[in-house]
A protein has these predicted regions:
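Conserved HGGG/HGGXW glycine-rich cap/lid loop of the alpha/beta-hydrolase fold
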Residues: 9-65
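Catalytic active-site module of serine/aspartate enzymes centered on a nucleophile-bearing elbow/loop
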Residues: 231-257
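Active-site nucleophile elbow and catalytic-triad environment of alpha/beta-hydrolase enzymes
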Residues: 175-190
Length: 257
């Protein structure tokens, strides 16, 4: 099983295919397993896929202070540093990023910090700004504890994070912290520093974020493109995988990647 050690913690990763690299960044409840219906199509199109479980997710170790880390200002810069280290370990020169929801925040932060590493970035269902604290927003949008979730999502979380951790992880992740933080969230100040082609791929009926978030992302980057998936819920990769693959592929082709 491919693990590498980053900051003293075992981080799980997978690499598939050859060609230009695409790094897939999972969302705030996810791990590499969520990409199972997405990555093979990109391998078939001649790309190399890199995906990994960020610290504390999936099969990666969380460390003794994970809760404090998750709720701290360290989360975003350390998530960037983790990807930079993985890039060194795998000896990849530059790559495309596809970030789902919170993964898009990690991707944008990375593209701002290391512009010469990033050929393009796609963000899907990523929040651009909040009008209330994340604690307030999440209490409104995700009121149900793990035991009150539907069986399908419970089983998925157990598959992703293990039977021992799924409930405590979900109940932690649904409060506040992670890439969206604990207070009022706003990506707009950093977006003008993203210099590569940027695709904003958004659903028209996310239970979390409205399409005005997509427009704000699109308006604030210098090389933005905007695609809205009609009749699609928050988890775009899961609800409309064929469209997800098609739109990202044509974006990459349009920029000669």
């Amino acid at each position: 099983v491919p693990f590498t050690e980053i900051n003293g913690l075992k981080i799980y990763y997978e690499m598939h295919g050859d060609g230009d690299a695409i790094v897939l960044l999972h969302h705030g409840f996810g791990c590499t397993k969520m990409w199972k219906d997405i990555y093979p199509a990109f391998v078939d199109k001649g790309y190399r896929i890199v995906m990994y479980d960020r610290r504390g997710y999936g099969q990666s170790e969380k460390g003794s202070d994970f809760k404090a880390f998750y709720e701290s200002d360290r989360f975003r810069p350390e998530s960037v540093a983790e990807l930079a280290r993985l890039r060194d370990v795998l000896d990849i020169d530059s790559f495309h990023i596809v970030g789902q929801c919170e993964g898009g925040v990690v991707g944008i932060d990375y593209a701002v910090r290391y512009p010469h590493h990033v050929n393009s970035i796609t963000v899907s269902s990523t929040q651009c700004y909040s009008t209330m604290t994340m604690a307030e927003l999440n209490a409104l949008k995700m009121p149900n504890p793990f035991r009150d979730l539907g069986p399908e999502i419970r089983e998925k979380l157990i598959d992703w994070h293990g039977v021992d951790h799924a409930e405590s992880f979900y109940n932690q992740f649904r409060t506040y912290g992670g890439a969206y933080g604990t207070g009022v969230f706003d990506l707009r100040p950093v977006l003008p520093s993203v210099t590569c082609p940027t695709l904003v791929l958004y659903p028209d009926r996310s239970f979390l974020f409205g399409v005005e978030q997509a427009e704000a992302l699109y308006r604030n980057v210098s090389k933005g493109e905007l695609a809205i998936l009609p009749h699609c819920g928050h988890n775009t990769y899961d609800e409309q995988p064929e469209e997800y693959i098609r739109i990202i592929s044509s974006f990459l082709k349009r920029h000669n990647f």
